[in-house]
């Protein structure tokens, strides 16, 4: 088993499975999202996972502007030239359990090798895990990497209507990227 598979099995899979169990409907589909606390719970779960990754030069902060859905900014200082922004989201669309195949449920992580089934695992819960693990593996290999900033929102499935005020408010923190990578498979 290579190192990325080890991290997937021992670290990402358990956390991503917990993420699947959080309904976390996007604000358009759950008007009481703030009271429900599920969007915040997805960010908190991901931050707990980040804490255990041993990534050098990493910091993160959850942001909340007024009544807007929360945004997480993760910054990993570069050891080489360049700046990259990685975009991802943690909110989900409503699901209809009756439309799922036998033995599957949107809020229950099911592993059928090599696939993991559950709402939000592909669109788009994996994004932050992928980015952070990629940088972790580069660091473990002693390879230089650019400054990496992740912006992870919780309103994408509603059309990202909460994102523009954050982009404006966090403009300095987001830096001057050479590249923007959108980690959204649209699954």
Question: Regions from the language model: what does each represent?
Answer:
Residues 1-119, 138-145:
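Acidic/His- and Gly-rich active-site-bordering loop/insert found
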Residues 120-187:
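Acidic/histidine-rich catalytic neighborhood of metal-dependent amide-processing enzymes
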């Amino acid at each position: 088993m290579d190192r990325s598979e080890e991290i997937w099995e021992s670290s990402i899979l358990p956390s991503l499975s917990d993420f699947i169990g959080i309904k976390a409907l996007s604000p358009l589909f759950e008007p009481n999202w703030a009271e429900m606390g599920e969007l915040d719970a997805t960010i908190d779960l991901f931050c707990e996972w980040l804490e255990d990754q041993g990534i050098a030069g990493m910091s993160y902060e959850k942001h909340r502007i007024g009544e807007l859905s929360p945004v997480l900014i993760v910054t990993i200082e570069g050891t080489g030239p360049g700046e990259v922004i990685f975009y991802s989201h943690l909110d989900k669309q409503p699901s209809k359990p009756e439309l799922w195949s036998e033995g599957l449920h949107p809020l229950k992580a099911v592993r059928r090798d090599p696939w993991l089934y559950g709402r939000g695992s592909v669109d788009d819960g994996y994004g932050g895990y992928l980015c952070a693990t990629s940088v972790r593996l580069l660091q473990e290999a002693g390879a230089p990497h650019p400054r990496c900033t992740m912006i992870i929102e919780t309103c994408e499935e509603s059309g990202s209507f909460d994102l523009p005020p954050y982009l404006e408010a966090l403009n300095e923190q987001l830096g001057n990227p050479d590249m923007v990578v959108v980690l959204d498979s649209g699954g």
